[in-house]
């Protein structure tokens, strides 16, 4: 595997899951694979789980790691071509990216949607430039449209906790005071569509996602109806995708908060969220603190998903 930006890059998903479970049994069995290899992790946006889990995964494989926060201590980067650079951005991404590639073997990039230009966001303007100009394997640590490391961890978690071969998985929109990207819900829907699970997406009207990610999922505007018989509830806020409201908060309807009354409609479902979570906006205290909440095991699996991806990339390098 050269690059990792979506579920399709993994190839055989069942095989990738098996690799993940083997790694989870012994995280250090491939500790020589990354010897004398350096991972550069580039953050345009804040991170807790992604930063820690990916760095730990690289260390498990014997890699050296360098972490660069673009907005703290590095030069501000210009991303547009044709711009007269007489402002506060002294370096262009087109020089910075190949320079970064000189100092590492693998690059991880975290760059959220900016909500300034929908086309730029959905063409992955930042991530794609690293793939094009770095001459290194590149993987997404969350980009404008997808968060594949999170979705892989979500899938690992569901496989561990499911009680039936084809569980009903419901992704529900929930309120949030700020405008959030569609990357996590897009990615989660895409990965769930790659399984044979029953997948339902529920949200208020106006929060429809890009159809290419929704795929074969059933869309239900009645949240309580969607919850009926669910085995997993995956809560997440996202801003509007459809024009002319792209990137905007068009509702903060608190009736969409996941609470115990709604969870009682499910098949004793497990509650999932990628974290960080706004308590009593996204989910009530009693639900996230309940025995059915698996947000911590879900977060722990971020290390496993990252290590599986890095292992596959390193094996690709060793075959060159």
Question: Where would I find each of the regions flagged by the language model?
Answer:
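Hydrophobic/aromatic ligand-binding patch that stacks against planar heteroaromatic rings
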Residues: 57, 99, 130, 191, ...
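Positively charged, low-complexity intrinsically disordered leader regions
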Residues: 1-52, 56
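Phosphate-coordination loops involved in phosphoryl transfer and adenosine-cofactor binding
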Residues: 33-39, 166-168, 268
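Rossmann-like adenosine-cofactor binding region
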Residues: 212-287, 292-293
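Phosphate/diphosphate ligand-binding glycine-rich loop within oxidoreductases
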Residues: 32-41, 47-159, 278
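Glycine-rich phosphate/diphosphate-binding loop of Rossmann-like nucleotide-binding domains
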Residues: 44-67, 159-236
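C-terminal helix-to-coil terminal segments
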Residues: 289-320
């Amino acid at each position: 595997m050269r690059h990792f930006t979506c579920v399709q890059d993994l190839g055989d998903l069942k095989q990738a899951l098996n690799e993940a479970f083997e790694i989870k049994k012994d995280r250090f069995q491939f500790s020589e694979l990354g010897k004398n290899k350096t991972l550069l992790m580039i953050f345009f946006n804040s991170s807790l789980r992604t930063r820690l889990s990916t760095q730990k995964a690289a260390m498990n494989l014997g890699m050296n790691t360098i972490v660069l926060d673009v907005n703290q201590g590095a030069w501000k980067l210009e991303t547009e071509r044709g711009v007269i650079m007489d402002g506060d951005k002294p370096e262009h991404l087109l020089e910075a990216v190949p320079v970064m590639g000189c100092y590492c073997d693998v690059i991880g990039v975290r760059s959220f949607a900016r909500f300034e230009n929908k086309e730029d966001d959905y063409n992955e303007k930042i991530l794609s430039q690293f793939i094009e100009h770095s001459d290194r394997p590149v993987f997404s640590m969350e980009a404008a449209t997808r968060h594949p490391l999170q979705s892989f961890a979500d899938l690992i978690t569901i496989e561990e906790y499911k009680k039936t071969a084809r569980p009903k998985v419901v992704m529900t929109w929930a309120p949030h005071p700020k405008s959030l990207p569609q990357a996590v819900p897009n990615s989660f829907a895409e990965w769930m569509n790659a399984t044979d699970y029953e997948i339902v997406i529920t949200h208020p009207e106006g929060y429809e996602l890009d159809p290419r990610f929704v795929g074969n999922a059933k869309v239900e505007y009645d949240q309580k109806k969607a919850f009926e018989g669910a085995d997993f509830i995956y809560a997440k806020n996202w801003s509007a995708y459809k024009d002319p409201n792209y990137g905007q908060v068009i509702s903060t309807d608190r009736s969409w908060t996941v609470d115990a009354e709604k969870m009682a409609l499910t098949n004793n479902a497990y509650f999932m969220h990628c974290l960080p979570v706004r308590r009593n906006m996204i989910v009530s205290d009693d639900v996230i603190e309940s025995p059915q909440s698996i947000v911590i095991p879900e977060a722990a699996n971020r290390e496993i998903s990252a290590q599986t991806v890095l292992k596959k990339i390193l094996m690709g390098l060793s075959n060159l």
